[in-house]
């Protein structure tokens, strides 16, 4: 009986995938591609093996939906520790383990090194997971710079026979930078998913910005994603100073980007707190529901705010003024929505950089009969006296910005504050469908997590999270006033393309007088 040849690591790859000539060809592509070096390999894995992996995952893996400020996705845990599973569990994921070991094999790491010129890669640090993007899932702009990451990769396991069309969404989108650490508003290169396709790029501080386009169809965009790391302690090529150097580089780059950030907030003085005069009430009644202007009404609001640190006022604007605004906003919604920053025209501007926020905005100076949103209201001395009466806080300065969050595009990522603030939002989003939180567009306040290894803005995961302080869906004619303590996270969740309209609002921050 003849000897049976044992399969090798190379047998787990597609024919000729690791040939020297292929590495040379891919290296030329990698170094030519922009906006930063990247390359696509297809096919990479033995087709039968990868089909078995997909079948294993569909049948044996539990996916948990996780929602944060930056993403919505179905995830597995870290798959590096497959070796630690019991024998039954290992057997249920034996093909996945074969692919994991193939990706981190000496043969493939050497192939990646030849393509990228990145130098040695860690054999011991396996860092990967399986993600499924269902309809509505997305990942916002970021650069992947964490720890010792060197190469970021994604291996697609979308349906192998039907194919994945670009109009399904889910593309990996790459962003150029206006300067290091400052990505442009718009992506310049898009890589749609394909079966058995590996896309990878070098993780470079200040440059490797990318996102994942929302998935628009009821088809699972399944992928194995992960990173190759620089050598770890004890491995050839280990550099003990790498992480410190990366942090230093990032801090230096971040300090240089502030001048480009938009909008730029200018704070304006606030009048001294005083009771409302009849003239004040007459002025405000042109805008605000009279129920919120009576002495008794103001006293009730003030008591509620003192107790809860938040009030939410429905039908805030009077009916006549609200109807006028509604017509303006619906007329604007019926016009083609400018999606690329080059299509945005005065008086609107695009908020950047997109790894912090993206939306259209009107700044403090933009007001008048041709401006859709009532930017003049909070500038009125009468309104400033009213908000101080309601909040019970003497205020010294404020800024405001009118915003439009477009479906399929806009969001703010979680920010924290160094001092306590008073925040007011007048939400003017038309239609009842915009209030469906499955489509995002809600404003959220959360307790920040002090553990740097925890994703602070996770608010939907394995268990019901009690870190949410306040969640406000987009709505029509609703005014919210929030006392935001130091360290509280706040963001507006990405607006899905499924939303029936934009989120429109006027957001303002008010600085209390120091005690």
Swiss-Prot record:
Organism classification: Eukaryota, Fungi, Dikarya, Ascomycota, Taphrinomycotina
Keyword Oxidoreductase: yes
Outcome when changing residue 210 to A: Reduces nro1-binding and leads to constitutive activity for sre1N degradation
Top-rank EC class of the record's enzyme: oxidoreductase
Superkingdom of origin organism: Eukaryota
Cofactor annotation comment: Binds 1 Fe(2+) ion per subunit.
A Pfam family assignment: Ofd1_CTDD
Fe2OG dioxygenase domain location: 119-230
GO annotations of cellular component type: cytoplasm; cytosol; nucleus
Residues holding Fe cation: 142, 144, 210
Effect of residue 142 to A: Reduces nro1-binding and leads to constitutive activity for sre1N degradation
Membrane spanning residue stretches: none
Role this protein plays: Prolyl 3,4-dihydroxylase that catalyzes 3,4-dihydroxylation of 'Pro-62' of small ribosomal subunit uS12 (rps23 and rps2302), thereby regulating protein translation termination efficiency. Negative regulator of the stability of the N-terminal transcription factor domain (Sre1N) of sre1 which is released from the membrane and enters the nucleus to activate hypoxic gene expression.
UniProt subunit comment: Monomer and homodimer. Interacts with nro1.
Cofactor(s) demanded: Fe(2+); L-ascorbate
BP GO terms, sorted: cellular response to hypoxia; negative regulation of SREBP signaling pathway; peptidyl-proline di-hydroxylation; positive regulation of proteasomal ubiquitin-dependent protein catabolic process; regulation of translational termination
Species, as recorded: Schizosaccharomyces pombe (strain 972 / ATCC 24843) (Fission yeast)
Family: Belongs to the TPA1 family.
UniProt: 2-oxoglutarate binding residues: 156, 221
Catalyzed reaction equations: [ribosomal protein uS12]-L-proline + 2-oxoglutarate + O2 = [ribosomal protein uS12]-(3S)-3-hydroxy-L-proline + succinate + CO2; [ribosomal protein uS12]-(3S)-3-hydroxy-L-proline + 2-oxoglutarate + O2 = [ribosomal protein uS12]-(3S)-3,4-dihydroxy-L-proline + succinate + CO2
EC number, UniProt record: 1.14.11.-
Listed GO MF terms: iron ion binding; L-ascorbic acid binding; oxygen sensor activity; peptidyl-proline dioxygenase activity; protein sequestering activity
SMART domains according to UniProt: P4Hc
Record's subcellular location: Cytoplasm; Nucleus
Keywords tagged on the record: Cytoplasm, Dioxygenase, Iron, Metal-binding, Nucleus, Oxidoreductase, Transcription, Transcription regulation, Vitamin C
Protein name: Prolyl 3,4-dihydroxylase ofd1
Keyword Oxidoreductase listed: yes
């Amino acid at each position: 009986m003849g000897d049976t040849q044992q399969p090798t690591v190379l047998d787990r790859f597609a024919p000729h995938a690791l040939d020297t000539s292929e590495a040379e060809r891919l290296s030329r592509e990698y170094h030519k591609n922009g906006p930063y070096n990247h390359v696509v390999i297809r096919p990479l894995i033995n087709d039968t093996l990868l089909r078995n992996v997909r079948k294993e995952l569909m049948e044996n893996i539990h996916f948990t939906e996780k929602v944060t400020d930056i993403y919505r996705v179905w995830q597995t845990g870290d798959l590096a520790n497959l070796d630690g599973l019991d024998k039954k569990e290992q057997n249920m994921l034996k093909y996945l383990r074969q692919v994991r070991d193939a990706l981190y094999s000496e043969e493939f790491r050497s192939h990646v090194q030849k393509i990228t010129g990145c130098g040695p890669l860690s054999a011991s640090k396996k860092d990967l997971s399986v993600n499924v993007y269902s309809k509505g899932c997305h990942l916002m702009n970021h650069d992947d710079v964490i720890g010792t990451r060197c190469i970021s990769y994604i291996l697609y396991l979308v349906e192998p026979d039907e194919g994945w069309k670009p109009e399904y969404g889910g593309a990996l989108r790459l962003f150029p930078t206006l300067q290091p650490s400052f990505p442009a508003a718009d992506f310049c290169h898009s890589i749609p998913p394909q079966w058995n396709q590996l896309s990878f790029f070098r993780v470079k501080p200040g440059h490797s910005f990318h996102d994942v386009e929302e998935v628009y169809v009821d088809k699972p965009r399944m992928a194995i994603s992960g990173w190759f790391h620089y050598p770890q302690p004890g491995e050839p090529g280990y550099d003990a100073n790498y992480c410190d150097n990366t942090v230093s580089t990032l801090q230096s780059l971040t300090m240089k980007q502030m001048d480009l950030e938009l909008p730029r907030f200018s704070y304006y003085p606030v009048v001294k707190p005083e009771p409302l005069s009849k003239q004040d009430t007459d002025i405000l009644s042109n805008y605000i529901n009279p129920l919120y202007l009576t002495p008794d009404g103001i006293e009730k609001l003030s008591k509620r705010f003192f107790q809860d640190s938040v009030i939410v006022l429905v039908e805030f604007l009077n009916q006549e003024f609200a109807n006028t605004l509604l017509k303006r906003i619906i007329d604007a919604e019926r016009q083609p929505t400018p999606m690329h920053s080059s299509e945005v025209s005065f008086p609107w501007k695009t908020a950047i950089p997109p790894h912090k926020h993206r939306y259209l905005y009107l700044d403090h100076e933009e007001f008048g009969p041709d401006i859709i949103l009532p930017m003049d209201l909070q500038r009125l001395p009468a309104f400033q006296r009213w908000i101080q009466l309601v909040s019970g806080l003497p205020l010294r300065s404020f800024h405001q910005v009118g915003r439009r969050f477009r479906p399929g595009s806009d969001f703010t990522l979680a920010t924290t504050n160094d001092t306590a603030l008073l925040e007011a939002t007048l939400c003017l989003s038309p239609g009842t469908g915009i209030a469906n939180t499955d489509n995002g567009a809600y404003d959220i306040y959360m307790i920040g997590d002090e553990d740097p290894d925890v994703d602070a803005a996770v608010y939907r995961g394995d268990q019901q999270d009690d870190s949410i302080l306040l969640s406000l869906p987009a709505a029509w004619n609703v005014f919210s006033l929030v006392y935001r303590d130091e360290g509280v996270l706040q963001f507006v969740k990405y607006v899905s393309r499924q939303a029936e309209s934009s989120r429109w609002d006027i957001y303002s921050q008010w600085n209390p007088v120091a005690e």
